[in-house]
C-alpha cells in the first residue's frame, strides 16, 4: 500500500502488510536477533546493529536528533520473504533546523511475521547536513560501529 504515513512504524506496516504479525509495540515488529545494516553510513555512525536491544539503543540516541513531518511510501516490490520498498520522509535536524528530506531504499527479510534483517540505503550527505556536519553528527550519534 503506497501513500503517506505519520510514523515510520505505520510506513513499515503499510509496506509489509499481512507479512507482519500484529503487534502492540514498534520494536516487536523486529525479531529478537534482527540484523540492521546501513551500507552508506558515514564515519562515526553504526554500519550494523545486531539484536533488538541494539536497535532500541540506536533509536533512543537518534530519535531526539531528527524531527519527522511525514513519510511517503513510493513503491513496494515483494518477493517471497524479502520485500524491497522505496520511501521518503520530510523533516529536519532538531538542533539545526536544517532540512532532512531523505529518500530510502529498504531491503527487508521477514521470518515468522517479524523483520529479521533490514538493509537501509540512504544518502548520508542529507543526514550530515541536517545534523550539523560530520563532526557534530558523529558526536551526537555516539560513533559506535556495532552494537550487540
Q: Where are each of the predicted segments found?
A:
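Serine/threonine-rich low-complexity intrinsically disordered regions
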Residues: 3, 7, 19-25, 50, ...
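A solvent-exposed, acidic/Ser-Thr-rich amphipathic alpha-helical stretch
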Residues: 5, 23-80
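Short acidic-aromatic low-complexity motifs
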Residues: 1-33, 146-148
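Residue-level detector of alpha-helix boundaries and kinks
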Residues: 10-11, 19, 40-43, 93
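Short, flexible active-site loop motifs that bind/organize anionic cofactors or intermediates
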Residues: 16, 45, 117
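Generic alpha-helical hydrophobic packing signal
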Residues: 4-15, 34, 52-56, 84, ...
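A beta-strand edge to alpha-helix "cap/lid" segment located at domain peripheries
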Residues: 1, 60-148
Amino acid at each position: 500500500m503506497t501513500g503517506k504515513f505519520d510514523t515510520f512504524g505505520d510506513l513499515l506496516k503499510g509496506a509489509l502488510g499481512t507479512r507482519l504479525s500484529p503487534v502492540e509495540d514498534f520494536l516487536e515488529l523486529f525479531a529478537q536477533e534482527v540484523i540492521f545494516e546501513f551500507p552508506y553510513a558515514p564515519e562515526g555512525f553504526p554500519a550494523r546493529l545486531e539484536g533488538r536491544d541494539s536497535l532500541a539503543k540506536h533509536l533512543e540516541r537518534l530519535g531526539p536528533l531528527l524531527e519527522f513531518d511525514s513519510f511517503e511510501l513510493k513503491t513496494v516490490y515483494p518477493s517471497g520473504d524479502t520485500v524491497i520498498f522505496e520511501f521518503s520522509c520530510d523533516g529536519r535536524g532538531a538542533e539545526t533546523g536544517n532540512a532532512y528530506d531523505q529518500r530510502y531504499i529498504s531491503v527487508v527479510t521477514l521470518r515468522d511475521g517479524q523483520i529479521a534483517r533490514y538493509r537501509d540505503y540512504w544518502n548520508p550527505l542529507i543526514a550530515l547536513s541536517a545534523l550539523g556536519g560530520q563532526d557534530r553528527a558523529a558526536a551526537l550519534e555516539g560513533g559506535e560501529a556495532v552494537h550487540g
